[in-house]
């Protein structure tokens, strides 16, 4: 009996030791794989345009978080958490896109949408190049090939080790970033790092950044295009607050040079809630704001007194939401899911905003919808 007990205990010890060794080995692998991309990294500009920018016209620019081609109407994401009206907590399920064919179809859809709008400039976020989660579809290549007469820049903001969570559908290894397109010649581009968490969660989060593309204007100033994707899940919004400060400093520095600045993308901040231009009497709010879910914990709001300087103006619309919560699929929960406007543009005060519109496509290709800004350039300093 004692021998049997010893064998059982010995077997359990070996099994437990093996499990511990695997866990330690995996943690070591994640730690070794982690590195932050250097700040102020010079980016390659793929030059296809021969057009110079004349200040005396109206331009259009789009921004679109394409969600790595995964967020079709039947998709929910494992990191998204929300609460129903009765307080019931709901959590998304998936880490990867369902099928490679679905990623290709979604990517083709977001390309076609922007092509039909014939914009002068375009920002895309969550553009995968070689990721497990998007079945290794090179979305950046697809986008740039479709806009072959545009200059293009790609800045990496997610380069992870193979992540084993969620265990039911591991997200795997990721390579993803921000893609910027311009009909006009981009003279140079740079990647600037955002502050991120210094805790253990940094090993699983994006390497947050914004890409800066400079275009010469015929009045001896620069049009500075900034493609940005701020943090989403930092508790208490402390990291996002630091990122806002970086944005403010960048604006002041560029505007003081007399340059025009368009800072666009996914701010992961509600751009309407405290906006003085969009305060509604009870019952007068847009129809799309009628949903049953409670505001998610991750959603912060832009503070229009603290987060902006005199050099900045928010270009945003309330005609449609730009983001839906992904803690549940859209199908079956269209009237329940929390929706918001977190995508748009903040521009320098020497830019005239002609109009802004959120394109309502029913969240067909992503958990975000595109935003279009028409603008003109005023006199530089």
Give the ranges of each region predicted by the language model.
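Solvent-exposed loop/turn segments at secondary-structure junctions
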Residues: 66-69, 127-131, 157-161, 186-187, ...
């Amino acid at each position: 009996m004692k021998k049997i007990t010893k064998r059982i205990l010995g077997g359990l010890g070996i099994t437990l030791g093996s499990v511990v060794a695997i866990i330690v080995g995996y943690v070591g692998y994640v730690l070794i794989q982690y590195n932050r991309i250097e700040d102020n990294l010079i980016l390659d500009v793929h030059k296809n345009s021969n057009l110079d920018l004349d200040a005396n016209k109206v331009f259009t620019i789009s921004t679109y978080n394409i969600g790595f081609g995964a967020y079709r109407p039947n998709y929910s994401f494992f990191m998204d958490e929300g609460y129903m009206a009765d307080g019931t907590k709901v959590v998304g399920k998936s880490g990867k896109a369902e099928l490679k064919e679905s990623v290709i179809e979604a990517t083709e859809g977001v390309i076609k949408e922007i092509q039909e709008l014939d914009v002068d400039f375009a920002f895309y976020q969550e553009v995968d190049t070689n990721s497990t989660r998007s079945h290794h579809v090179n979305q950046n290549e697809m986008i740039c090939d479709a806009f072959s007469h545009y200059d293009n820049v790609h800045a990496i903001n997610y380069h992870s080790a193979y992540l084993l969570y969620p265990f039911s559908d591991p997200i795997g290894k990721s390579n993803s970033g921000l893609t910027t397109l311009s009909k006009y010649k981009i003279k140079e581009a740079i990647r600037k790092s955002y502050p991120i968490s210094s805790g253990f969660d940094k090993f699983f989060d994006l390497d947050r950044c914004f890409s800066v593309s400079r275009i010469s204007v015929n009045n001896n100033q620069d049009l500075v295009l900034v493609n940005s994707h701020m943090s989403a899940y930092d508790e208490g919004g402390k990291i996002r607050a630091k990122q806002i400060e970086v944005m403010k400093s960048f604006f002041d520095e560029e505007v003081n040079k007399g340059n025009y600045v368009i800072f666009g993308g996914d701010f992961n901040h509600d751009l309407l809630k405290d906006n003085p231009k969009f305060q509604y009497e009870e019952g007068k709010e847009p129809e799309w704001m009628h949903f049953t879910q409670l505001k998610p914990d991750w959603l912060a709001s832009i503070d229009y007194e603290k987060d902006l300087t005199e050099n900045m103006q928010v270009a945003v619309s309330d005609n449609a939401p730009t983001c839906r919560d992904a803690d549940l699929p859209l199908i079956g929960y269209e009237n329940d899911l929390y929706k918001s406007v977190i995508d748009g543009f903040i521009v320098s005060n020497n830019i005239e905003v002609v109009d802004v519109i959120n394109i309502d496509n029913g969240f067909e290709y992503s958990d975000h919808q595109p935003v279009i800004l028409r603008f003109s350039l005023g006199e530089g300093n």
